[in-house]
């Protein structure tokens, strides 16, 4: 390629991004974010915060604004900093609504309780019915706003070419520390890490990611504040510009090296948690493990059976599933899969960290799952191994922990309304009639029927300690609706389940600082049944085992256990309920000024999110320059893209070769649509990258994207353009010139339900089918047509290993059929990327076995050691054939070998493949260069793993 053409390619590259939508449609995968309903956005304004909400979340928005302003004042004082710009808060009444947000480019996972976005400093968060959790998240995210503001202030005051990043444990740990600190679940994780000897050093923790970093970071910040003073936090942000990296800055500000402070922190943690060993015993000693990687167990015994079968959620295969196994005399049988989840729209999510299962006496499993826009209650027949019923309810977006009535005619569950409030509901079968049992702002969870069906016990934050996260057990009289305390105290009593055998309620409580199992009778007299140093949840009494089935946490993993109370674990009876109780708490923020504020309608206003530009100069030949700009509104529903470039040579002016693209995308509804206009001029290449042509064109286009479900969608593009084209090699493309109006249409069907590791997909299936047609309107003929199919299947062979299969087919025709190239490291390894393995007909098969080689990889650089995620190995076989109508006698080309996959930033990988070429039939018609005719080859690749 000449330098002139290189400059031309730089100039038109920006414009090609927009007009190349057909290529994106052919090769694009990914799951869908669906806007099931439109939101009528409104804005409440405080002193520092702009609160964006919709009418269903109006009351919640006022609570959010009041507490955000209160938190701002607290953080302003503690961090001695004022954020100079207004802070946008976008609040959603449920996580189901939050999953539709366009502020993030991906679907927020259920564990994501809030996010602070960098470009606009926006905070977005959902309400899940838990007031204390919500307040914690508000302050946590506001800490991130202050962190970004402090960083921006220092960057403006002391600009540097390179600014290093603070480690995740520092930033998230500070947000946790300044929010509320560790709760009992955080303590459970920290205790487990400390007692198991897995506590990392601060240097090692720098390379850790995931949820476990949050409590560890919070504990580190607490230790640093208590030992060295909280004032050093602000010093870190204001003086970090002086130092080359975090370790040097830390040593200067704290007066000791990171390694020394790491030893001090680990000793502090051991002093904190080692004494608990004298007060309890691990689950490995006190209980029998029934299942690994399992949570939310429930036991069911068929009338004719002497042993129970335990049902539970398990992600052992990557996807969440419902499993079952028999339990008899303390032992467990083989696991079987009952319901497969997270593969289709019917069982999109089981909410297995927050929702329980239940089984009726005749073997019908009741559970909830996300089904399109909201949750559904599913009834699964064990005998028939099929769905027996599915129920959705208007106005209820979330369904948690369904529980059967003793007579099997109804189910009670915890439901979250579209306004964000959590209440108890009862559904009657078979007609699905819904009855509301509670109606207030409190979070009511995990209901369970008494053996006579007259009373429902549940866990709720309606206790006097609820605003700070406390939960107690309550009982509801089904006939009268009266609610009264069953337990009382400043702790968390959770997951009650009423035993139909002894009439007791078995539940979990953290009243001694660790989640233990208790039992309480209808009079409120209880007994502690476990004293473990780990954690125990979701108990159920199994009479034939004379023990308790429960979920436990140990070795950083959840499992299912059975324990028999004995003299060591059964303690003296404890009176759990109080005679006189203080009144329930209320949302104090509703008494504040924001409660009476007037909301203004949201007005769409674009602001700049991203801008970039570049210049290329070839002395004596010419120059090229270009820039791109991306704008969006505050909610992220509307995007505006603008690109401009030009190419100037000795024989042309800047204005003569101006290229531009303007594109608007509307993501506010289920049907995403975009319109754009373009003008391009320069040298281009067909899909084979070996057929060059000069073209000057202008026109407009429309793009449509309609998700059928989270896993399936239809994409379409329509383009009308005025084109003047000159083929540089007319024998390859059908003619010397073309000047005409062209209408192009592309339609694609895409499915993707894959699971990913850092190095690429490991389970599931993804495929796309695309058809395209370009009409020459000026001459009344088909300019070109094409059809493309790409199927990829991933079969897991282990927790981190899989077989990856890819099948590709391509066909094109018309006056100027587009050729495809299947050579190179992305398709057919060991063969040239350009010019040779091209044609208008093609098929390709890839088979690769991927397996882990190392968990982590540390590389030493002159500036220090860097630790990266583990290396993956691979063994592969490729086989493909590409031809045209005039070269139909070509044989197939193949390659086999092994390689290594090195993850950088997911999904980008470095890939090194070494192998051997082989061929079938007549391969000489490809005209391969000499270096591609030898047997051995080495391929190096940077990009995405198929």
Locate each region found by the language model:
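A flexible loop/linker signature enriched in serine peptidases of the S9 family
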Residues: 290-292, 313-324, 341-354, 366-378, ...
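C-terminal outer-membrane beta-barrel translocator/porin domains of Gram-negative envelope proteins
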Residues: 594-597, 688-690, 703, 731-879, ...
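Juxtacatalytic substrate-recognition/specificity segment
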Residues: 26-167, 184-186, 203-206, 249
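Active-site-proximal alpha-helical
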Residues: 75, 169-170, 174-185, 192-259
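Repeated loop/turn-to-beta-strand initiation elements of outer-membrane beta-barrel proteins
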Residues: 433, 482, 635-640, 668-675, ...
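Beta/coil-rich, acidic/histidine-enriched accessory regions frequently appended to metallopeptidases
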Residues: 28-35, 40-43, 208-211, 235-355
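Outer-membrane beta-barrel initiation region
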Residues: 558-559, 564-674, 738-761, 825, ...
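Transmembrane beta-strands of outer-membrane beta-barrel pores
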Residues: 462, 619, 633, 644-650, ...
